[in-house]
Each structure stands twice: as C-alpha cells, then as structure tokens.
C-alpha cells in the first residue's frame, strides 16, 4: 500500500497512559516505519494542569479542550471544536481512524463525513459496562444508544475480541470486524524477572499474585480482598487511581506499588508467579496479554476480551463472574502448583501477536474502507 495520510482522532492520548493511548502510540510507530503520514487529534490536559505535547515523535498533535465527567469516566473527555475540522481539512487525510470514539470521536466522525473521508471506528472502551460499575444503569442504556448511532455512521467498526464483536452486533451495529492488539514480546518476557524485587515484595517467600491496572470501580479490584486476607500468598497491586486509598484500607497486607511503566512494568510482571485480572468489562484486556508474554499463568472472569486470550487449563483459568471471589483461592493454588507448565504455554501463546503483525492488519482495514468509498463513487 502506497503512502497513506491517516488522521487519528483519539478519545485518549498521552500524557494519559491507558489501553487507548498505548495502542495509538503503537499505530503511530508502525505508520512512520512503513512510510505513512499521520496527524493526531486528542484532548488537552484539563484546566489547571500543564499543557500536553503538541508534537509526538515527529507527528503533529492537534489538541482540543477537555472536561472531566466523573460519573462516566475517570479520564478527561475531549470537546470537539470547529478548529478540529480546519485541522483535518488542512491535513487532507485519506482515512480517519477513530480511536475509542465517544464525544471527541463523534465530532471527528462528522468532520470526516463532511470532508468525504472514510472512517474506521475502533471500539476499545466498554463505557456502558463502566457506567453499570459506577451504579448508573440509565447511563449504560444511554451509552448504548449513543454508540449505536455513532458506529452506524462509520464505514467500518473494529472490535478487539470475539465477545465484543458479538456484543456490538447484538446492539445492531453493522460492518463490525475484528482487530486485536499486539504485544511487545521483547519487553514483556520471563527474562525480566527480578529476584531482588521478589524478595522485597515477599520476604517470607510466599507465592506472589499480581494485578496490574487502573484502580477504579470498573476494575473490581475489591474482588481480591479475600485472597489478600487468606495469608497464603502475597498480593501485589500495580497501578493507581481513585480507588487506591479505599483498596489499601481494605487490603492492608497487599503491596501497592503505584503505576509502573516501561522496564519497571516489565520487571513487575515477570517477578510475579500468577496474574489475576478482576474486572469483566474488558473489550480486549491488554494487561492479560502482557502477563502471558511475561510467562505468567492468568486468572480472569469468564467474560469479554480475556476469553480470546486465555486457554483454560493451558495458559490460565476463566472463572464465572458470579463465583469469581469464591473460586479464586483454589484457582490460585492450582496455578502456583502447576506454574511451570502453564508458564511455558502462556509465553508461547502470544509469540505471534507482535505489534507489526497486528498493525499490518489495520492497514488492510484502512485500504478496505478507501476501496469501498472509491467503488461507491464510481
């Protein structure tokens, strides 16, 4: 495919670090490496914070104002502006990539339609599920109505997992295709294991069970409280968020490291014995894939993205959502006992999922919507 001009309208981007921003960074790296041009449109930091970068690795980042909506998400949401349309028109894209579109993505979608540019909408965040976790089911219903309207206007919707595809199709969203996520198998690897770190976390030698992620209601980290209280393992929680103080109070024996990135994050994964993910509202669940790459057997709820990533009784265990807490201690004990067998299979299961391979698939989706528009125009 010859050089393509791709405008990425990202609902979240650096300095926010999450699944959406991380995947956008990987896509940008691949576009640059393969000779394509990019523009990013993303939220600025909220009022009162330092301005976010306007240039990322040579790629222009057009920032829009952001606002906080704490009853819907802990992340700032970008507000579409007319300047965004001007930025798109000036860049003259061949395709507009909508990364986890919500409010800003909706503005980007309409701007693209006004300019006659095809769109690929990447569904990455289970906002309806998050709303339910925050105890506001009416918002969940409204969110589905919003996403149905938005994605029906896109030329193609990409879902990261089979479960998410099925959910979107059940909601009446058309033209849904699967596009998974890659993983850096060089960075996330068993070789990153750090024995000094392990001794600091568990000086008495107890098996180390870890969680990595944002400490927010939708992650249901409180489901690990019983495991922490059992005393059979050392629970290590890597991440930060609005629930941290409450969780630390509920799990005084757990180790809370705060957020970790890069080499420190890779060492944290590899220094665990078993990985547990506690939330069921995951469209993909990149942390599970990173844990598998690190050679960890994984336990997760039998819902959403982890179903595509975990092979039960081979790379980990999927537990019924309603029985997760009850079954968790026995599941952990089993994986600790059989760790070596599971660890080898876990690592092997992700070796073919590198970011270059996955991003080449994305380029194919770009080409498909461009071809569809060309055919319609003819």
From Swiss-Prot:
Belongs to the glycosyltransferase group 1 family. Glycosyltransferase 4 subfamily. One of its GO terms (molecular function) is mannosyltransferase activity. Keywords: Glycosyltransferase, Lipid biosynthesis, Lipid metabolism, Phospholipid biosynthesis, Phospholipid metabolism, Transferase, Virulence. It is an enzyme of class 2 (transferase). PANTHER family: SULFOQUINOVOSYL TRANSFERASE SQD2. InterPro entries: Glyco_trans_1 (IPR001296), Glyco_trans_4-like_N (IPR028098), Glycosyltransferase_grp1 (IPR050194). One of its GO terms (cellular component) is membrane. Gene3D superfamilies: Glycogen Phosphorylase B. Its EC number is 2.4.1.-. The keyword Lipid biosynthesis applies. It comes from Mycobacterium tuberculosis (strain ATCC 25618 / H37Rv). Was identified as a high-confidence drug target. One of its GO terms (biological process) is phosphatidylinositol metabolic process. Catalyzes the addition of a mannose residue from GDP-D-mannose to GlcAGroAc2 to generate 1,2-di-O-C16/C18:1-(alpha-D-mannopyranosyl)-(1-4)-(alpha-D-glucopyranosyluronic acid)-(1-3)-glycerol(ManGlcAGroAc2). The keyword Signal does not apply. Pathway: Phospholipid metabolism; phosphatidylinositol metabolism. This is GDP-mannose-dependent alpha-mannosyltransferase.
